[in-house]
């Protein structure tokens, strides 16, 4: 199937063909990938908590030290096109996951609507509903489960 030249880049390019800027722009800014997750030892299901990484701004859902995040948070996960087969743990609304699955971006995504606030206004992000990992002991994270990764 031919895709028109004027189609958005995420519909006409493979993940590997994206520039670094195009790749980064797929991020909708929801911050969900920066929430602490727990894995069920019985069935390996991944559950999101409302506990945010210490670097995540709880209102803007942006990393407060993006350039140095790996030095400050050694287990921070770097999303790359080469790891697309591992994106199943990302929310079903995630731009990276959607594009890797050959799906289009939702109407509220900033690349579609031009408004980076829509991710918050549509309540896709957890803006204002998260707790910092500084404020919750790791033993209590299970008390803050919000959804299961699909």
From Swiss-Prot:
Domain of life: Bacteria
Source organism: Pseudomonas putida (strain ATCC 47054 / DSM 6125 / CFBP 8728 / NCIMB 11950 / KT2440)
Cross-referenced PANTHER family: UPF0260 PROTEIN YCGN
Ranges annotated as spanning the membrane: none
Protein name listed in UniProt: UPF0260 protein PP_4587
InterPro entries assigned: Puta_zinc/iron-chelating_dom, UCP006173
Protein family: Belongs to the UPF0260 family.
């Amino acid at each position: 199937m031919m895709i028109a030249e004027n189609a958005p880049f995420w519909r006409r390019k493979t993940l590997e063909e994206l520039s670094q800027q195009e790749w980064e722009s797929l991020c909708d800014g929801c911050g969900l990938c920066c929430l602490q997750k727990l894995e069920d030892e019985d069935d390996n299901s991944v559950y999101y908590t409302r506990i945010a990484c210490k670097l995540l701004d709880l209102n803007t859902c942006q990393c407060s030290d993006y350039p140095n995040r790996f030095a400050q948070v050694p287990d921070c996960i770097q999303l790359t096109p080469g790891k697309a087969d591992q994106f199943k743990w990302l929310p079903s609304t995630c731009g990276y996951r959607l594009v890797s699955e050959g799906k289009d971006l939702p109407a509220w995504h900033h690349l579609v609507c031009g408004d980076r606030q829509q991710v918050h206004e549509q309540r896709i992000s957890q803006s204002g509903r998260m707790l910092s990992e500084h404020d919750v002991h790791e033993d209590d994270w299970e008390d803050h489960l919000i959804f299961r990764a699909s």
